[in-house]
Amino acid sequence: TILFSLLIVLTFITGCKSDKQLTDYVNPFLGTATLWEPEDLGYVRKMKARTWGAEVFPGASLPNAMVQLSPVTQFHSGSGYQYEDTVIYGFTHTNKGHWNLCHIPLLPVTGTVTPSDYCSHYNHDNESAHPGYYQVFLERYGVNAELTSTLRCAFHKYTFKPEDDKKLVADMTRSNNRVKEWGIQKVDDHTFSGFQDGEGKMYFYAVSNYKVKDIEQVKDDKHEVSVVDFDESKGKEPLEL
Protein backbone atom coordinates (compact mmCIF):
# COMPACT_ATOMS: atom_id res chain seq x y z
CA THR A 1 0.00 0.00 0.00
CA ILE A 2 2.82 2.39 0.89
CA LEU A 3 4.63 1.57 -2.37
CA PHE A 4 1.42 2.06 -4.37
CA SER A 5 0.81 5.45 -2.70
CA LEU A 6 4.39 6.51 -3.43
CA LEU A 7 3.99 5.61 -7.09
CA ILE A 8 0.81 7.70 -7.27
CA VAL A 9 2.58 10.72 -5.71
CA LEU A 10 5.56 10.39 -8.08
CA THR A 11 3.23 10.12 -11.07
CA PHE A 12 1.37 13.25 -9.92
CA ILE A 13 4.59 15.23 -9.44
CA THR A 14 5.91 14.16 -12.84
CA GLY A 15 2.62 15.12 -14.48
CA CYS A 16 2.79 18.60 -12.92
CA LYS A 17 6.31 19.27 -14.17
CA SER A 18 6.53 22.65 -15.91
CA ASP A 19 8.00 23.08 -19.38
CA LYS A 20 9.32 26.51 -18.38
CA GLN A 21 13.00 27.25 -17.87
CA LEU A 22 14.12 29.12 -14.76
CA THR A 23 15.03 32.10 -16.95
CA ASP A 24 11.37 32.34 -18.02
CA TYR A 25 10.61 33.68 -14.54
CA VAL A 26 13.21 36.47 -14.71
CA ASN A 27 12.04 40.07 -15.22
CA PRO A 28 15.05 42.24 -16.23
CA PHE A 29 13.06 45.41 -15.51
CA LEU A 30 12.87 44.74 -11.76
CA GLY A 31 14.94 47.36 -9.96
CA THR A 32 15.14 49.79 -12.89
CA ALA A 33 12.69 52.33 -11.40
CA THR A 34 13.85 55.16 -9.16
CA LEU A 35 12.42 55.26 -5.64
CA TRP A 36 10.49 58.47 -4.94
CA GLU A 37 8.00 57.78 -2.14
CA PRO A 38 8.97 58.01 1.57
CA GLU A 39 7.56 54.54 2.30
CA ASP A 40 9.92 53.10 -0.32
CA LEU A 41 12.93 55.27 0.49
CA GLY A 42 12.65 55.07 4.26
CA TYR A 43 12.99 58.84 4.61
CA VAL A 44 11.40 62.08 3.41
CA ARG A 45 13.20 63.71 0.47
CA LYS A 46 14.38 67.29 1.12
CA MET A 47 15.51 68.08 -2.43
CA LYS A 48 14.15 67.62 -5.94
CA ALA A 49 17.16 65.72 -7.26
CA ARG A 50 16.76 62.14 -8.44
CA THR A 51 17.02 59.59 -5.67
CA TRP A 52 18.40 56.06 -5.85
CA GLY A 53 16.85 52.85 -7.09
CA ALA A 54 18.48 49.48 -7.48
CA GLU A 55 20.55 50.93 -10.38
CA VAL A 56 20.32 47.82 -12.55
CA PHE A 57 20.00 47.63 -16.34
CA PRO A 58 17.48 45.68 -18.48
CA GLY A 59 19.74 44.95 -21.45
CA ALA A 60 21.42 41.80 -22.78
CA SER A 61 24.32 40.24 -20.89
CA LEU A 62 25.82 36.91 -19.91
CA PRO A 63 27.33 36.26 -16.45
CA ASN A 64 30.84 37.73 -16.10
CA ALA A 65 30.81 38.94 -19.71
CA MET A 66 32.97 41.71 -21.17
CA VAL A 67 29.91 43.16 -22.95
CA GLN A 68 26.61 44.35 -21.49
CA LEU A 69 24.37 45.81 -24.21
CA SER A 70 21.69 48.07 -22.77
CA PRO A 71 19.71 51.26 -23.47
CA VAL A 72 20.64 54.63 -21.98
CA THR A 73 17.77 56.93 -21.04
CA GLN A 74 19.98 59.43 -19.22
CA PHE A 75 23.75 59.68 -18.89
CA HIS A 76 25.30 60.05 -15.41
CA SER A 77 22.29 58.34 -13.85
CA GLY A 78 23.58 55.19 -12.23
CA SER A 79 23.16 52.32 -14.68
CA GLY A 80 22.06 54.72 -17.44
CA TYR A 81 18.49 53.36 -17.57
CA GLN A 82 15.64 54.67 -15.44
CA TYR A 83 12.22 53.12 -16.01
CA GLU A 84 10.34 56.40 -15.61
CA ASP A 85 12.32 58.17 -18.37
CA THR A 86 10.66 58.60 -21.75
CA VAL A 87 13.57 58.83 -24.23
CA ILE A 88 16.51 56.67 -25.29
CA TYR A 89 19.88 58.21 -26.23
CA GLY A 90 21.57 55.05 -27.40
CA PHE A 91 22.58 51.48 -26.70
CA THR A 92 25.85 51.16 -24.82
CA HIS A 93 28.22 48.24 -24.47
CA THR A 94 29.55 48.31 -20.90
CA ASN A 95 27.43 48.32 -17.76
CA LYS A 96 28.13 46.81 -14.37
CA GLY A 97 25.05 48.35 -12.82
CA HIS A 98 25.04 50.98 -10.07
CA TRP A 99 27.36 53.56 -11.71
CA ASN A 100 29.89 54.43 -14.43
CA LEU A 101 30.74 52.79 -17.76
CA CYS A 102 28.04 53.02 -20.52
CA HIS A 103 30.66 53.17 -23.27
CA ILE A 104 30.19 53.35 -27.06
CA PRO A 105 26.59 54.65 -27.36
CA LEU A 106 24.98 53.80 -30.73
CA LEU A 107 21.48 54.75 -31.89
CA PRO A 108 19.82 53.91 -35.23
CA VAL A 109 18.39 57.03 -36.88
CA THR A 110 17.03 58.31 -40.18
CA GLY A 111 17.03 61.67 -41.92
CA THR A 112 18.94 64.76 -40.82
CA VAL A 113 20.67 64.48 -37.43
CA THR A 114 20.65 67.33 -34.90
CA PRO A 115 23.56 66.63 -32.51
CA SER A 116 21.93 68.18 -29.44
CA ASP A 117 18.52 66.62 -30.15
CA TYR A 118 18.63 63.14 -31.63
CA CYS A 119 17.16 60.96 -28.83
CA SER A 120 13.96 59.01 -29.46
CA HIS A 121 10.80 58.59 -27.42
CA TYR A 122 9.70 55.06 -26.63
CA ASN A 123 6.82 53.34 -24.86
CA HIS A 124 7.00 50.48 -22.39
CA ASP A 125 4.15 48.82 -24.31
CA ASN A 126 6.62 48.41 -27.19
CA GLU A 127 9.58 47.33 -25.05
CA SER A 128 10.48 43.83 -23.89
CA ALA A 129 13.35 42.00 -22.24
CA HIS A 130 14.30 38.57 -21.01
CA PRO A 131 17.71 37.17 -20.06
CA GLY A 132 20.10 37.74 -22.95
CA TYR A 133 17.67 39.77 -25.08
CA TYR A 134 16.29 43.33 -25.21
CA GLN A 135 13.85 44.92 -27.68
CA VAL A 136 12.35 48.38 -28.06
CA PHE A 137 10.58 50.39 -30.77
CA LEU A 138 12.08 53.85 -31.34
CA GLU A 139 9.08 56.04 -32.09
CA ARG A 140 10.93 59.02 -33.55
CA TYR A 141 12.61 56.96 -36.27
CA GLY A 142 10.17 54.08 -36.70
CA VAL A 143 12.94 51.58 -35.95
CA ASN A 144 12.54 48.30 -34.07
CA ALA A 145 15.75 47.60 -32.15
CA GLU A 146 16.74 44.11 -30.98
CA LEU A 147 19.87 43.42 -28.94
CA THR A 148 21.69 40.37 -27.68
CA SER A 149 25.27 39.54 -26.70
CA THR A 150 27.89 36.89 -26.10
CA LEU A 151 30.75 36.93 -23.61
CA ARG A 152 32.77 39.33 -25.77
CA CYS A 153 30.51 40.58 -28.55
CA ALA A 154 27.32 42.58 -28.98
CA PHE A 155 24.75 41.90 -31.69
CA HIS A 156 22.45 44.68 -32.95
CA LYS A 157 19.47 44.18 -35.28
CA TYR A 158 17.64 47.31 -36.45
CA THR A 159 14.53 47.01 -38.61
CA PHE A 160 13.87 50.29 -40.44
CA LYS A 161 10.92 51.24 -42.61
CA PRO A 162 11.73 50.06 -46.17
CA GLU A 163 11.70 53.60 -47.57
CA ASP A 164 13.96 55.12 -44.89
CA ASP A 165 17.71 55.67 -45.05
CA LYS A 166 19.83 53.82 -42.50
CA LYS A 167 22.19 55.66 -40.17
CA LEU A 168 23.77 55.27 -36.75
CA VAL A 169 24.58 58.04 -34.31
CA ALA A 170 27.77 57.24 -32.42
CA ASP A 171 27.84 59.69 -29.51
CA MET A 172 31.53 59.23 -28.78
CA THR A 173 31.83 62.23 -26.46
CA ARG A 174 29.50 60.64 -23.90
CA SER A 175 29.65 57.84 -21.37
CA ASN A 176 28.90 57.72 -17.66
CA ASN A 177 32.56 58.60 -17.14
CA ARG A 178 34.10 61.84 -18.42
CA VAL A 179 35.41 61.17 -21.94
CA LYS A 180 38.84 62.77 -22.37
CA GLU A 181 39.58 61.52 -25.88
CA TRP A 182 37.79 59.53 -28.56
CA GLY A 183 38.07 58.42 -32.17
CA ILE A 184 36.05 56.67 -34.86
CA GLN A 185 36.98 55.70 -38.42
CA LYS A 186 35.89 53.58 -41.38
CA VAL A 187 38.10 50.48 -41.73
CA ASP A 188 36.67 48.99 -44.94
CA ASP A 189 33.36 48.71 -46.78
CA HIS A 190 31.67 46.78 -43.96
CA THR A 191 33.68 47.77 -40.88
CA PHE A 192 34.24 50.75 -38.61
CA SER A 193 36.12 51.01 -35.33
CA GLY A 194 36.99 53.46 -32.59
CA PHE A 195 37.68 54.11 -28.93
CA GLN A 196 36.68 56.17 -25.92
CA ASP A 197 39.12 57.22 -23.21
CA GLY A 198 37.25 57.85 -19.99
CA GLU A 199 39.22 56.57 -16.99
CA GLY A 200 40.62 53.84 -19.24
CA LYS A 201 40.42 53.27 -23.00
CA MET A 202 37.57 51.20 -24.45
CA TYR A 203 38.02 50.01 -28.05
CA PHE A 204 35.38 48.64 -30.41
CA TYR A 205 35.33 46.98 -33.84
CA ALA A 206 31.97 46.86 -35.64
CA VAL A 207 31.09 44.75 -38.69
CA SER A 208 27.89 45.55 -40.63
CA ASN A 209 25.85 43.61 -43.19
CA TYR A 210 25.38 46.91 -45.07
CA LYS A 211 28.23 48.78 -46.71
CA VAL A 212 29.50 51.81 -44.79
CA LYS A 213 29.30 54.84 -47.11
CA ASP A 214 30.99 57.33 -44.80
CA ILE A 215 31.28 58.60 -41.24
CA GLU A 216 30.48 62.28 -40.80
CA GLN A 217 31.20 64.52 -37.83
CA VAL A 218 28.11 66.62 -37.15
CA LYS A 219 28.10 69.42 -34.58
CA ASP A 220 25.99 72.33 -33.47
CA ASP A 221 26.61 74.97 -30.79
CA LYS A 222 25.90 72.44 -28.00
CA HIS A 223 27.13 69.01 -29.02
CA GLU A 224 29.00 66.85 -31.54
CA VAL A 225 28.21 63.34 -32.76
CA SER A 226 29.51 60.93 -35.39
CA VAL A 227 26.98 59.75 -37.99
CA VAL A 228 27.62 56.44 -39.76
CA ASP A 229 25.80 56.38 -43.10
CA PHE A 230 25.08 53.05 -44.82
CA ASP A 231 24.63 52.08 -48.45
CA GLU A 232 21.05 51.20 -49.44
CA SER A 233 21.83 48.24 -51.71
CA LYS A 234 20.17 45.66 -49.42
CA GLY A 235 16.97 47.68 -49.20
CA LYS A 236 14.47 45.99 -46.91
CA GLU A 237 16.86 43.84 -44.87
CA PRO A 238 17.42 44.87 -41.23
CA LEU A 239 20.70 46.58 -40.41
CA GLU A 240 22.84 44.18 -38.39
CA LEU A 241 26.07 44.79 -36.47
Predicted regions and their residues:
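Bacterial N-terminal signal peptides
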Residues: 4-11
